């Protein structure tokens, strides 16, 4: 039998990528990877290491000890071989810290959101999501097979109207507690009241609230709403706790259900022991060094003053609106050239016309570092970028 006939392919099936790349480049929306050195040579105002714990010696030692005891990997799904005492200890301690009855670890904050939203909804459910909800919550809504209503940012009346007009038996309201792009706070008390009027569940992503608001325990705890039976929290271990992983925190019945029903939990390898050990140690540091959350907010306020941002920051995030993506890129590059690394948010991360510098404060910023930030940010924002603000 002869060799199969080769049909020539005149056009690569990936040729369309070239056109997409050109469009992104022309719009100033290309992204690239830039490895960071093991010892930073620039002032970091871009990472999510809010409490400065990723390099804390106790946190590193917690990860090292877990590696020595449990090995490098979890070795499998937590339902098979990937569960350890360490995982369950962190779940219990984190739940107690935020005032929840129980917790369940996931491999990231992203998968925690997928697991919670998809696992607690499905066909015949209504999901009401804030327009600025994190991408992981957006993707969870898409995967849920539920009907989804996206409401304007922080618009409680729109949420109430969506719940009031529903035909579905089950409903869920989804929001960040602290919105990542601009650092604004969700109206959690009002959202919970709307949920209770219409028998809906409230799911809150505390990724940017944990370690910063409520003395570290999160915005829900700060408002006196922790432990509510109709609220589920999600969070990440990769921001304030300086490690990696995610968690769903809420009633014990939710934990039990997600173990049975959350596909990102069932079919994913358990969180690596080193990450669990580091996060557990970080939680211990957060409890012991209670000055850290307040220092984050104080440093954020100082950064906002430097950048002439009129709103008082309510979180670690300071958003400097520049509008045009090319202007934002140029400003971020100028800061980096001067020794200060800042975030640069452009579409599709933020809406068109709202490209910005995103600064994140850390508890561990020294007076000398704040002075460097003042000098560089003032020079950059009073330069070419200022004309476009």
From Swiss-Prot:
Positions of post-translational N6-(pyridoxal phosphate)lysine modification: 239
Coiled coil spans: none
Any one biological process term the GO annotation gives: biotin biosynthetic process
Pfam families in UniProt: Aminotran_1_2
Residues that bind pyridoxal 5'-phosphate: 109-110, 180, 205-208, 236-239
Listed EC numbers: 2.3.1.47
Record has Endoplasmic reticulum as a keyword: no
SUPFAM superfamilies per the UniProt record, alphabetical: PLP-dependent transferases
Catalysed reaction, written as an equation: 6-carboxyhexanoyl-[ACP] + L-alanine + H(+) = (8S)-8-amino-7-oxononanoate + holo-[ACP] + CO2
Signal peptide annotation: none
Family: Belongs to the class-II pyridoxal-phosphate-dependent aminotransferase family. BioF subfamily.
PANTHER family: 8-AMINO-7-OXONONANOATE SYNTHASE, CLASS II AMINOTRANSFERASE/8-AMINO-7-OXONONANOATE SYNTHASE
Originating organism: Mycobacterium ulcerans (strain Agy99)
Name the record gives this protein: 8-amino-7-oxononanoate synthase
Pathway(s) it belongs to: Cofactor biosynthesis; biotin biosynthesis
Keywords, sorted A to Z: Acyltransferase, Biotin biosynthesis, Pyridoxal phosphate, Transferase
């Amino acid at each position: 039998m002869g060799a199969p006939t080769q049909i020539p392919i005149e056009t690569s099936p990936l040729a369309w990528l070239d056109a997409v790349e050109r469009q992104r480049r022309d719009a100033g929306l290309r992204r690239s990877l830039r490895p960071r050195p093991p010892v930073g040579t620039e002032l970091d105002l871009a990472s999510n290491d809010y409490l400065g714990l990723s390099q804390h010696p106790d946190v590193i030692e917690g990860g090292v000890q877990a590696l020595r005891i449990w090995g490098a990997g979890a070795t499998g799904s937590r339902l098979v071989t990937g569960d350890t005492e360490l995982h369950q200890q962190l779940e219990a301690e984190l739940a107690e810290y935020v005032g929840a009855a129980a917790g369940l670890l996931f491999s990231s904050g992203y998968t925690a959101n997928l697991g919670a939203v998809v696992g607690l909804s499905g066909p015949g459910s209504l999901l009401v999501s804030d327009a600025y909800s994190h991408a992981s919550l957006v993707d969870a809504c898409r995967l849920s097979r539920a009907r989804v209503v996206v409401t304007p940012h922080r618009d409680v009346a729109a949420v109430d109207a969506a719940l009031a007009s529903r035909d579905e038996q089950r409903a869920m309201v989804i929001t960040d507690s602290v919105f990542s792009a601009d650092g604004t706070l969700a109206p959690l008390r009002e959202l919970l009241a709307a949920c209770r009027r219409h028998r809906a569940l409230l799911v809150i992503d505390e990724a940017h609230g944990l370690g910063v608001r409520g003395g570290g325990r999160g915005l829900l705890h700060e408002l006196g709403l922790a432990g509510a039976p109709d609220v589920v929290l999600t969070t990440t271990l990769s921001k304030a706790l300086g490690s990696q992983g995610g968690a769903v925190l809420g009633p014990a019945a939710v934990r039990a259900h997600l173990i049975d029903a959350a596909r990102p939990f069932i079919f994913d390898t358990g969180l690596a022991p080193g990450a669990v050990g580091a996060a557990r140690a970080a939680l211990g540091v957060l409890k012991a060094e209670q000055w850290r959350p307040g220092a984050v907010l104080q440093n954020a306020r100082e950064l906002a003053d430097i950048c002439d941002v009129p709103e008082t920051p309510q979180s670690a995030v300071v958003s400097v609106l520049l509008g045009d993506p090319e202007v934002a890129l140029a400003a971020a590059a100028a800061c980096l050239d001067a020794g200060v690394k800042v975030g640069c948010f452009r579409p599709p991360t933020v809406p068109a016309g709202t490209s910005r510098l995103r600064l994140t404060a850390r508890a561990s910023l020294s007076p000398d570092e704040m002075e460097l930030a003042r000098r560089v940010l003032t020079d950059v924002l009073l330069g070419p970028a200022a004309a476009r603000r």
